[in-house]
Every structure is written in C-alpha cells, then in structure tokens.
C-alpha cells in the first residue's frame, strides 16, 4: 500500500510540474487580457455621468455594473429630450445594502 502512495505522489508531482509550464503561458495571456480590461475600464462612464450616447458604456460598481437609466426631460419650449445617466438600479442597491449589512454582522 505504501508503494502505491509513493508512486501516486510522484505522478502528481510530475504532472503538476509539467502543467506549471503551460500555466505560465496562460498567465501571460491572462495578464494581457487584464491589461486590455483595465484600458476599457478607464474609458467607461463613471456613476452619475451622462450616458445618452453610449448606453452600454457604464463602469462597474462595487458588486454590479452600473446601468444607464434614462428619463424624458421637457424643456421650457415644450420639446422632449431623453437624458440618461449611469446609476445603480434599486434592486442592486438593495443587494449591496444586504451584503454590507451581512459583512457588519459576520465580520
């Protein structure tokens, strides 16, 4: 039984060593992907800023991506225009509140 465990441990060690070289290549690809995501994150629209022209470009909040929320504004001339801003929807606010409350209770 001891021989089987030793052989198994050697096989696991060899497999993990050989796969670690492949993981290094994956880590380089992931790093490039993360750098690209960081660039798009810099170009996103922050909370409470106008998103009328780019309704899918809102940034991420603490837990969720902000949503472009639109309202119809009537000017003094009676002209209706749509104005949009990035914000947190009510159901996301409730979820963030519950998570914050849970963190306070459970540490």
UniProtKB/Swiss-Prot annotation:
Transmembrane segments: none annotated. One of its GO terms (cellular component) is extracellular region. Expressed by the venom gland. Belongs to the neurotoxin 19 (CSTX) family. 04 (U1-Lctx) subfamily. This is U1-lycotoxin-Ls1e. It is found in: Secreted. Disulfide bonds join 44-59, 51-68, 58-86, 70-84. One of its GO terms (molecular function) is toxin activity. Keywords: Disulfide bond, Knottin, Secreted, Signal, Toxin. Residues 21-41 form a propeptide. It comes from Lycosa singoriensis (Wolf spider). PROSITE patterns: SPIDER_CSTX (PS60029). Pfam families: Toxin_35.
């Amino acid at each position: 039984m001891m021989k089987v465990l030793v052989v198994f441990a050697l096989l696991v060690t060899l497999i993990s060593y050989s796969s670690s070289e492949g993981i290094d290549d994956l880590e380089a690809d992931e790093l490039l992907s993360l750098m690209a995501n960081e660039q798009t994150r810099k170009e996103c629209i922050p909370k409470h800023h106008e998103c009328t022209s780019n309704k899918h470009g809102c940034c991420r909040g603490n837990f969720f991506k902000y949503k472009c929320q639109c309202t119809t504004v009537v000017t003094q001339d009676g002209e209706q225009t749509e104005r949009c801003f990035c914000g947190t929807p009510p159901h996301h606010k409730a979820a963030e509140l519950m998570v914050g409350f849970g963190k306070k209770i459970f540490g």
